């Protein structure tokens, strides 16, 4: 009898509308469980047949951080193509690979972890107005119209064309006027209404009204003094009432925490959570939001109606993605694993790369005239010709080609191609060129002798003495140093270069920094911000055992 009732229940549940499914599921959940589902890392709720799910996945220019994937040019390169059809074909390929990866995860373990899901935090629809902003390369363009057109195409390819089911969820970010690096977590953009509507809004408006984006991410910054993730004018008046948005608003990273830690717009986490929820922000990326909402509910800063309003939007997207749906009607469940970095997608990436290149100036040099015998040798200088740079938010392609390989193949036998690895980028000094003195080398002769003091002035005996193979680490994240109330340190070693020559040594860090070479001070800086200092040093191996010793390096 129980089996019969269960079978009828499932069949009815599968045939009912998404609205009915949401209403049915909502009634089964406690307030605590509802709050749990408003955080990106949503837990399993067994009695309601809800699987665990992490909303955080990235696909800026290909499925990112989930292993093998086709990697396309960064959005600033895609914007240079001015090709709407190409952008849609690219995002369609991305969503194919995303679906294949998601269903493989379900088959293997019954759920998807972070970066294995179907809810993607792309595209970035901010305006590329300032090259100093760290996320400029994530944007399509400095032009609102071009950004709008490419954004619509990207979203349509991600979400698919089925009237009921979403292929994946596209999240238009970061809403809005998010363009500043210096105060990125706590600054306020002062923007008049005309500039908003002519410059900052158009791409987001097109994403909602034309492409029907299912999700929007609120920005870290404030707009005219009110943080974007607690801004009812943006999230309710503009998004929902004016543009008709019915999807989920999620905060950028720890933006809700920043309401009280940076913006000082709220006094506590629970007050920040309440302000965000009531303004129209449905979900946060951070687990702290869960505790903030619980305390806000206990203190009656929010009520069940506020929670249910956000929950309905969240559950609606899960059902539109085909989760908890045994009907078999979802058209996107049978995309094979073989689409991931398939030959068609690699060819599409090549097409996009070729179309993204803009030649700004050519003094009759290109194309190289290889057939007239005037060019006999081509010199390529630097590691960029032998390294493949994918950019941030990237997958890991199994197939890639270096510039050296491309140029060599293109030139063929027409000229000689020579590559020189003239290192022009900073490189951590390998530990085999650094030698500790014998009395310090009880645990290894390579690298630096590090002496650490639980005070700020290198006074007294060191509290810790150890071997450090390099100085490329953050002391606050070091397990041996994390409990130090204050910290000062001294590192010593002898530097012996692989070859004679002029070397440029660079040191970067923050605080009070002194660097000595053979007892001569070469860096003496004090700053709370990052310090980066370089100096030239002549190292002649032929003199080491005659009149000039190896270079003794002391850093404090």
Kindly give the residue locations of the regions a language model identified:
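Short, surface-exposed beta-strand/strand-loop-strand elements in extracellular ectodomains
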Residues: 508, 512-522
């Amino acid at each position: 009898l129980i089996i019969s009732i269960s079978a009828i229940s499932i069949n009815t549940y599968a045939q009912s509308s998404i609205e009915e499914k949401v209403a049915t599921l909502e009634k089964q959940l406690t307030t605590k469980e509802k709050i749990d589902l408003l955080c990106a890392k949503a837990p399993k709720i067994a009695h309601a047949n809800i699987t665990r799910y992490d909303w955080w996945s990235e696909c800026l220019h290909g499925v990112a951080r989930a292993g093998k994937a086709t990697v396309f040019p960064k959005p600033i390169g895609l914007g240079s193509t001015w090709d709407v059809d190409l952008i849609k074909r690219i995002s369609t390929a991305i969503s194919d690979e995303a679906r294949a990866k998601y269903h493989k995860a379900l088959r293997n373990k019954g759920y998807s972890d972070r970066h294995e899901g179907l809810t993607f935090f792309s595209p970035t629809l901010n305006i590329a107005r300032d090259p100093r902003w760290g996320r400029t390369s994530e944007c399509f363009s400095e032009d609102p119209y071009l950004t709008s057109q490419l954004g619509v195409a990207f979203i349509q390819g991600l979400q698919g064309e089925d009237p009921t089911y979403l292929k994946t969820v596209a999240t238009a970010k970061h809403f809005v006027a998010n363009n500043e690096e210096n105060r990125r977590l706590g600054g306020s953009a002062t923007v008049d209404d005309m500039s908003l509507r002519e410059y900052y809004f158009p791409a987001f408006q097109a994403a909602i009204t034309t492409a029907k984006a299912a999700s929007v991410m609120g920005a870290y910054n404030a707009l005219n003094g009110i943080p974007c993730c607690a801004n009812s004018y943006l999230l309710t008046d503009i998004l929902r009432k004016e543009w008709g948005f019915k999807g989920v608003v999620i905060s950028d990273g720890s933006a809700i925490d920043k309401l009280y830690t940076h913006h000082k717009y709220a006094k506590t986490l629970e007050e920040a959570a309440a302000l965000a929820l009531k303004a129209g922000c449905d979900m946060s990326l951070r687990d702290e939001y869960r505790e903030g909402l619980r305390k806000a509910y206990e203190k009656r800063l929010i009520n069940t109606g506020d929670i249910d309003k956000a929950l309905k939007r969240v559950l609606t997207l899960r059902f539109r993605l085909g989760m908890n749906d045994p009907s078999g009607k979802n058209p996107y469940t049978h995309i094979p694993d073989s689409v991931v970095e398939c030959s068609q997608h690699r060819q599409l990436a090549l097409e996009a790369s070729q179309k993204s290149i803009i030649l700004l100036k050519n003094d009759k040099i290109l194309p190289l005239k290889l057939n007239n015998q005037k060019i006999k040798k081509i010199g390529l200088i630097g590691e960029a010709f032998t390294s493949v740079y994918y950019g941030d938010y990237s997958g890991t392609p199994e197939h890639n080609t270096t510039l050296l390989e491309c140029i060599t193949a293109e030139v063929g036998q027409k000229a000689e191609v020579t590559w020189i690895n003239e290192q022009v980028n900073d490189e951590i000094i390998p530990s085999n060129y650094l030698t500790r003195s014998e009395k310090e080398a009880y645990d290894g002769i390579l690298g630096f002798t590090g002496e650490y003091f639980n005070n700020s002035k290198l006074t007294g005996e060191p509290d810790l003495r150890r071997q450090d193979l390099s100085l490329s680490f953050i002391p606050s994240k070091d397990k041996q140093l994390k409990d130090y109330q204050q910290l000062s340190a001294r590192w010593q070693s002898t530097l012996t270069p692989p070859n004679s020559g002029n070397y440029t040594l660079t040191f970067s860090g923050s605080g009070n920094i002194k660097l000595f070479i053979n007892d001569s001070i070469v860096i003496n800086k004090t700053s709370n911000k990052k310090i980066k200092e370089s100096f030239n040093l002549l190292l002649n191996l032929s003199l080491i055992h005659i009149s000039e010793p190896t270079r003794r390096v002391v850093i404090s």
